[in-house]
């Protein structure tokens, strides 16, 4: 009607990444090719934070002026950018980064040199820290007539769901509470209607992020590299 083209595709799941172990990473960017060179050097420590999918923390532990303040601020900025663009363009969360050491050159150090040093140290740290894919988990509640309980439970299990409990709904039916990965919930409304002759209803809301199984992580990583 309005002559506007739309890109239509499957809904996207907001996967994230985190790390499983604490590591120390260092990168020294030093180049000399006649005239002014390039020099930037940072040492960082990375460690997992409490799970929650909320973000990351950067702590400046530089002492004695081994890196000038302007380059420390730049390292923080670069790490913040990379925390949202690492590997498969996924946000990195629940990671604490400490800038613990480094060095600079009075003449050769520059913003570019420290950008490169900080970015490579971050990437090397992520490689060493056993990165893991996190997927959003939904709290799902299904209200269904009792005769369809088996079909509802079986379908939730096929969707990698974990059933947390069942209650009477007060009108002769059952209320099922479960946690299910968001990626498995696409098309659920249609499937539920079909399995229960339209007599069951459901609701869902975000609950948490949880580490995805290895085969899911591999598939997501491969798809996002394309």
Curated annotation (Swiss-Prot):
Q: Say yes or no: keyword Nucleotide-binding present.
A: yes
Q: Which GO terms describe its molecular function?
A: GTP binding; ribonucleoside triphosphate phosphatase activity; translation elongation factor activity
Listed under GO biological process in this entry are: ribosome disassembly
Q: Where in the cell is it found?
A: Cytoplasm
Q: Does the keyword GTP-binding apply?
A: yes
Name the Pfam families for this protein.
EFG_C, EFG_IV
Record's GO cellular component, any one?
cytoplasm
Recorded hits in SUPFAM superfamilies, A to Z, give: EF-G C-terminal domain-like, Ribosomal protein S5 domain 2-like
Q: Which UniProt keywords apply?
A: Cytoplasm, Elongation factor, GTP-binding, Nucleotide-binding, Protein biosynthesis
In terms of one coarse class, where is the protein primarily found? Answer: cytoplasm
Domain of life of the source = Bacteria
Protein purpose: Catalyzes the GTP-dependent ribosomal translocation step during translation elongation. During this step, the ribosome changes from the pre-translocational (PRE) to the post-translocational (POST) state as the newly formed A-site-bound peptidyl-tRNA and P-site-bound deacylated tRNA move to the P and E sites, respectively. Catalyzes the coordinated movement of the two tRNA molecules, the mRNA and conformational changes in the ribosome.
Q: So what family is this one in? A: Belongs to the GTP-binding elongation factor family. EF-G/EF-2 subfamily.
Q: What is this protein called?
A: Elongation factor G
